[in-house]
């Protein structure tokens, strides 16, 4: 059953802590998308949840490089994008970007207290010590 279409280049998916919101990265767009998840599993209320920082426009359109997604225990959303790991509040406001030497592609919280953010991309892996804790009730 298809639940959404018209997403130019979907890449990266995550659920909110309460599993009522579906987040979808759009690599070829300017925005992280959000959908409300209904009781029957369908999704409604597609919206631009957060604007990626540093998205660029070229002859093929817009690209953000947005790929993997993770959440922390406070519901903040972490996006692996061309500029680094972008961090957004649960309301979609950009808090900042964790810079890396190469563009990241995926990420996950792990370790004691889930206070380590592992990030991979472009032939490299990174370990970032965090103050924030990853969401403990989910593997990623």
Give short role names for the model-derived ranges.
Residues 29, 39, 91-93, 132:
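Short coil turn/linker residues within repeat-based beta-strand modules
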Residues 1-4, 43-51, 96-100, 137-140:
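Beta-propeller fold detector
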Residues 106-140:
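Blade-level signature of beta-propeller repeat domains, shared across WD40, Kelch, NHL, RCC1
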Residues 1-21, 52-82, 101-115, 122:
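Beta-rich, blade/repeat-based domains predominating
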Residues 27-30, 42, 79:
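Short, solvent-exposed loop/turn segments at conserved positions within beta-propeller repeat blades
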Residues 30-32, 85-86, 125-127:
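Structural signal for beta-propeller blades
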Residues 34-43, 129-137:
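Short loop/turn segments immediately following beta-strands, especially the blade-tip
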């Amino acid at each position: 059953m298809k639940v959404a279409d018209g997403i130019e280049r979907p890449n990266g998916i995550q659920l909110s802590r309460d599993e009522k919101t579906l987040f979808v990265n759009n690599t070829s767009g300017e925005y992280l998308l959000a959908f409300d998840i209904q009781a029957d599993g369908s999704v409604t209320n597609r919206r631009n949840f957060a604007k990626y920082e540093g998205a660029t426009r070229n002859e093929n359109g817009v690209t953000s490089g947005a790929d993997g997604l993770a959440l922390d225990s406070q519901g903040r959303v972490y996006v692996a994008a061309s500029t680094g790991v972008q961090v957004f509040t649960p309301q979609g406001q950009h808090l900042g970007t964790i810079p890396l030497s190469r563009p990241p592609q995926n990420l996950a919280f792990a370790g004691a207290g889930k206070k380590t953010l592992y990030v991979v991309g472009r032939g490299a892996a990174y370990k970032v010590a965090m103050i924030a804790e990853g969401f403990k009730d989910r593997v990623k």
